[in-house]
From Swiss-Prot:
<dbReference type="GO" id="GO:0051301">
    <property type="term" value="P:cell division"/>
</dbReference>
<dbReference type="GO" id="GO:0009037">
    <property type="term" value="F:tyrosine-based site-specific recombinase activity"/>
</dbReference>
<dbReference type="InterPro" id="IPR013762">
    <property type="entry name" value="Integrase-like_cat_sf"/>
</dbReference>
<feature type="active site">
    <location>
        <position position="254"/>
    </location>
</feature>
<dbReference type="InterPro" id="IPR011932">
    <property type="entry name" value="Recomb_XerD"/>
</dbReference>
<dbReference type="InterPro" id="IPR044068">
    <property type="entry name" value="CB"/>
</dbReference>
<protein>
    <recommendedName>
        <fullName>Tyrosine recombinase XerD</fullName>
    </recommendedName>
</protein>
<keyword id="KW-0132">Cell division</keyword>
<dbReference type="InterPro" id="IPR023009">
    <property type="entry name" value="Tyrosine_recombinase_XerC/XerD"/>
</dbReference>
<dbReference type="Pfam" id="PF00589">
    <property type="entry name" value="Phage_integrase"/>
</dbReference>
<comment type="similarity">
    <text>Belongs to the 'phage' integrase family. XerD subfamily.</text>
</comment>
<dbReference type="Pfam" id="PF02899">
    <property type="entry name" value="Phage_int_SAM_1"/>
</dbReference>
<dbReference type="InterPro" id="IPR002104">
    <property type="entry name" value="Integrase_catalytic"/>
</dbReference>
<feature type="active site" description="O-(3'-phospho-DNA)-tyrosine intermediate">
    <location>
        <position position="286"/>
    </location>
</feature>
<keyword id="KW-0233">DNA recombination</keyword>
<feature type="active site">
    <location>
        <position position="176"/>
    </location>
</feature>
<dbReference type="InterPro" id="IPR011010">
    <property type="entry name" value="DNA_brk_join_enz"/>
</dbReference>
């Protein structure tokens, strides 16, 4: 496990990965080590065939090809590190074929579904309802990753024009790889956040100074609402808004934000910047989504009817 600790320290220092990415690497490596232990194998003496057996083992446990590929990528990077540190001379993952998978188009909500969700949330005037309304408005208005949303600080979104501050329409957020990007939000989001700020103190635990700095403070260890808690609240709101909670998640709201922008004529490069995608190919998935919608729309063309 010593080598794993060294590898994770290197990732943190040199690649500026997020905590969630580091945890993902750690889980993959520990799972791999547990498999090797059960097979009575040493990480420094395994063969490519051993790695192929491990991949078959993962597939036999119904792990999706995309997840298997991520694990393979983690282990490959780990062995590259071991070689660079002279712990071994051989990367057993180098000549392993990656399982093939189909790119699944992202699931999105229709604009009417978004409106239904926001309409329900805006009617709940309890402190919890006002907070959730602000969070959903902000997420759909900005396309933030859920980890970015819940960990926003007051200073990220407030100006210093007044003693209490005013809600910014434009602010910056630190995303994946510590890359800063500009976020623009609409007037409805500004209003919902301002309404929430008026009751925010309800959620502040003054005994825990750590949570004072966050926009959405919580008694959770990090000082802000957890991603999991927000996802649960979102699904609960969907249920009350007569929407299927199985088809609603923070990430689906992010997908909906991007897809609706594209539908409205926004440039793909602009959407890439707003989402914080390093590679335009990641954003291009939304063009395939639009093509799918167009094909479905064409089914209603009069010449397509018998």
């Amino acid at each position: 496990m010593e080598f794993i600790s060294q590898f994770l320290e290197m990732l943190l220092a040199e690649r500026a990965l997020s905590k969630n990415s580091i945890l993902s690497y750690k889980r993959d490596l520990f799972d791999f080590q547990n498999y090797l232990a059960k097979q009575r194998l040493s990480e420094l003496n395994i063969t490519t065939e051993n790695v192929r057996d491990w991949i078959e083992y993962l597939a036999s446990n119904d792990l999706q090809a995309r997840s298997i590929n991520r694990k393979i990528s983690t282990i490959k990077s780990y062995y590259e590190f071991l070689i660079s540190e002279n712990h071994t001379a051989f990367n057993p993952v180098l000549n392993v074929d990656l399982p093939k998978y189909q790119n699944k188009l992202p699931e999105i909500l229709s604009i009417d579904q978004i409106k239904s969700l926001l309409e329900y949330c805006s009617q709940d005037n309890s402190p919890e309802g006002i907070r959730l309304n602000a969070m959903i408005h902000l997420l759909y208005a900005s396309g933030l990753r859920v980890s970015e949303l819940v960990s926003l600080k007051l200073t990220d979104i407030l100006t210093n024009k007044t003693s209490k501050g005013e809600v910014r329409k434009i602010f910056s957020v630190l995303g994946k790889g510590n890359k800063e990007r500009v976020i623009v939000i609409n007037e409805q989001a500004v209003i919902s956040i301002a309404k929430y700020l008026a009751i925010r103190d309800v959620f502040v635990n003054k005994a825990k100074p750590k949570n004072l700095i966050y926009l959405f403070p919580s008694s959770a260890l990090a000082g802000y609402m957890t991603r999991q808690n927000f996802a649960i609240l979102l699904k609960s709101a969907a249920l009350y808004a007569n929407l299927n909670p199985e088809h609603i998640s923070p990430h689906i709201l992010r997908h909906s934000f991007a897809s609706h922008l594209l539908e409205g004529g926004a440039d793909l490069r602009v959407i890439q910047g707003l989402l914080g995608h390093a590679d335009i190919s990641t954003t291009q998935i939304y063009t395939h989504l639009q093509t799918n919608h167009l094909k479905k729309a064409l089914l209603h063309h009069p010449l397509n009817k018998n």
